[in-house]
Amino acid sequence: MDLNFFHKTRILDGGMGQELLRRGMKPKGTLWSASALLDTNYHKLLLDTHLDFIKAGAEVIVTTSFATRKIRLLENKIEDKFEYLNKKAGEIAQNTKKYYPNVLIAGGLPPQNLTYKPDIRSDNKIRDDFFNQAKLLNPYIDFFYFDVLSSIREIKIGIESIREFHKPFLVGMHISEGTKLPSGEKISDLIDSLDINGLLGITLSCVSPENFQSNLDEIKSLGVPFGFKLNAYLKTNPMPKLDKTNKNQKVINPNELLGIREDLTPEKMAQFAKKFKDAGATIIGGCCETRPSHIEMFTGLKD
């Protein structure tokens, strides 16, 4: 694909997991969105949800692979489904091209351990986990998307792990609150230590609009295409409550755990997005609690 793809304004999809829950998916354990891959009765629902984001204006969709990482499957005692679930995520996303051949598929590579926390395991373990998931998604995708990573170390290891696939990548960093990653590092620390060969751009992922505003100047200073996947959660820092829920494998709708901001209507979120676009952001998308209606409003920001 064109490495300059994000040099102009592009629209990404929104929050697949919460949208699936709204549409009737019943989560199993802590699998959340992966429940729609595990149960064949939900495969059409998953495809239709991808398609609705595209109809709303998304030029890029992300595979539903956030909860198909190995640790999440181990928690739910279905690690034997690792290959099946990741391939199915790629296959269903790829099927959207039958209807919209120009849509791009991003292979979502989430943190390979806990969400919103830096991975303190060995480099080799992290690298192997990224590689094994990337290998399964690779045949179905146009580029890789590192989704909601919490440390520069994980980002660097993740990039190393995909090099043999010769595909470009988008980096999605997470900041729960303030101006530092959960690892304590600053955004500006990233670019100095990163091999940017194949880098499409950098986003802040699963962040509130206000949090992105706080970090706008620093991410802009990196000198690469930048943007966001905004969430509409009430809580900006879900730890440690999310930790406890994951460890107990408690079945809970993340909407109930983290809350929903009623003020972030599609119109209000589009106002934030316009402000960020006017400041130079070209990668515009949503994360948790952003629906096709939000993405439709974002399309008005296209160049």
Regions found by a protein language model. Give the residues of each.
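Domain-level signal for soluble alpha/beta catalytic cores
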Residues: 1-303
